[in-house]
Every structure is written in C-alpha cells, then in structure tokens.
C-alpha cells in the first residue's frame, strides 16, 4: 500500500519485456466488482479468498512481473507459494510516507475508518514479519520509481546468476 508496487512493477515488466500482472486487477475481474465493493458486500475474508485463488494460479506464469496487494504477502501460505516460483521483492516505506502518498485515495477499503494513520501503523506492524521474509527488501521512501526499478532489476540479475 503506497510503496509503488504497481508503478515499479510496470517499469520492470517493460524493461524485461515480461507480462505485468496486478493481483488486485485480477481479483476485480474475477469478482466482477471493485475491491471496495468486495469489502463492502462480502467482507475482507472474501477478498482474501480471492487472493488465495489468484496466488494458486500465479505459479504457472512465466516471464511475468507480479504486483500483489500489501496484505497478500502477510499470509504465510501465500508467501510460501510465491517464493516457490519467484523472486519475492518487498517495497517498503514508513507509515508517515505511506500516509502522505495515499491520503487522497478513496479506493483503499482498509483505510476507510476514523483513524487511517493508526490503521497504517497497525497493518505494517502485523505485516512486517512477513515482509522481512522477502528475497529482496527495498526502501522506497527517497528513491524514484525508476531508481527502485533499477535496484530491483540488479537484484533480479544477481538472483538469476545463482
């Protein structure tokens, strides 16, 4: 959430001439409604079930850059599945920076409550142990999307050499 996953992912996919996959977009296509609407009508558990289904399908993709929602990697099962088939990269930013980036966005159902700043801190506290299990962890606070993409590309090239 607010770390640049989609922007950076698209840049990397373009550079590598890979397919770009956004799991949130796939979920919306499958559900036939927006993520906000899924949360409103069916709840977070239904959304997480869609995520699980999509992750199960991702293992068959080749030459793809996959951007996941911030909560997808906070599931041990999803993270293990992704790590079997891919280099898992976590883009990171502090709660303050994330808030600065997302505060005007209305499509983030987990931030619709009275105190979204606190919610961001709480979400990151729960998710951080999972995020730290990524193969590559990149702080995006002071880097442009292009700089982050270059860093991830370098890590990808190193991983391919192993």
Residue ranges and their predicted role:
Residues 11, 15, 61, 125-162:
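NTP-dependent small-molecule kinase module
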Residues 70-72, 94-96, 143-144:
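Short glycine-rich anion-binding loops that position phosphate/pyrophosphate groups of nucleotides
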Residues 22-83, 107-108, 130:
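ATP-dependent small-molecule kinase phosphotransfer cores
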Residues 3:
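ATP-binding Walker
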Residues 84-128:
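A glycine- and Lys/Arg-enriched "phosphate-lid" helix/loop adjacent to the NTP-binding pocket
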Residues 6:
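Walker A/P-loop
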